[in-house]
């Protein structure tokens, strides 16, 4: 439909423009707890939204706020990295217009509950798969520059999990610092 085409076009243009401001959009679900943003990223259908919904169930919807359920922006300011809500929030249309200090990024997979922090070399291909990569070399170079700094400064985790309260507790305990 025309609406879907417009959404895709505007999203791609937004993604290019945000690079000029040191931001990147990552296909993920971002949830805020205690003033910190936790990002869960994975391919479509893995369970990002399901996992952050479990956070709301565990902490309460007033304590676990979905910042953006599909494409938040990550951007570095003087005092660190922040997750921003965007209007590009996928089929759930859950987003808020705010920025929240980024606590960590978690690459999600289905499996038995376990989590570990990973190094940038392991994180880069996983996160790159969840970005909109510009075709223009200048924009792609800028995106890679931002991604490099992000991965050097923000902890990234790899988690296998099921749909359980235990998975929420495990991810929160590992990522909260």
Region spans (language model):
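Charged, amphipathic alpha-helical linker segments immediately N-terminal to NTP-binding catalytic cores
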Residues: 1-15, 173-177
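Short, intrinsically disordered, mixed-charge
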Residues: 11-20, 57
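Pre-Walker A adenine-sensing motif
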Residues: 17-33
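Glycine-rich, often acidic-flanked micro-motifs
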Residues: 28-29, 33-43, 57-177
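Conserved lysine of the Walker
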Residues: 48
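Post-Walker A alpha-helix
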Residues: 51-52
């Amino acid at each position: 439909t025309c609406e879907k085409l417009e959404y895709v076009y505007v999203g791609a243009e937004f993604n290019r423009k945000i690079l000029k401001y040191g931001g990147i959009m990552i296909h993920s679900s971002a949830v805020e707890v205690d003033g910190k943003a936790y990002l869960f990223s994975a391919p479509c259908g893995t369970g990002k939204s399901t996992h952050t919904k479990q956070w709301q169930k565990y902490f309460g919807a007033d304590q676990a706020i979905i910042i953006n359920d599909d494409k938040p922006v990550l951007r570095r300011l003087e005092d660190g990295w922040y997750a921003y809500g965007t209007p590009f929030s996928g089929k759930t249309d859950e987003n808020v217009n705010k920025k929240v200090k980024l606590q960590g990024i978690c690459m999600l997979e289905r499996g038995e509950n376990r989590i570990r922090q990973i190094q940038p070399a392991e994180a880069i291909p996983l996160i790159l798969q969840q970005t909109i990569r510009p075709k223009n070399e200048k924009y792609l170079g800028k995106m890679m520059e931002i991604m490099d700094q992000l991965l050097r400064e923000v902890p990234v985790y790899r988690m296998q999990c099921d749909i359980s309260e235990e998975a929420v507790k495990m991810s929160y305990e590992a990522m909260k610092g």
